[in-house]
């Protein structure tokens, strides 16, 4: 479903942000 795709995208974005922040 669209909502599921949206949740997975937002979750992936959050993880990427965490990695960027942690790495920085």
UniProtKB/Swiss-Prot annotation:
Keywords from the UniProt entry: Chloroplast, Membrane, Photosynthesis, Photosystem I, Plastid, Thylakoid
Locations listed in the record: Plastid, Chloroplast thylakoid membrane
One GO cellular component term: chloroplast thylakoid membrane
Topological category with respect to the lipid bilayer: Peripheral membrane protein
Main location as per UniProt: plastid
GO BP term, example: photosynthesis
Region (Disordered): 1-24
Superkingdom: Eukaryota
Matching Pfam families: PsaN
Family: Belongs to the psaN family.
Function: May function in mediating the binding of the antenna complexes to the PSI reaction center and core antenna.
Protein name (record): Photosystem I reaction center subunit N
Organism name: Cucumis sativus (Cucumber)
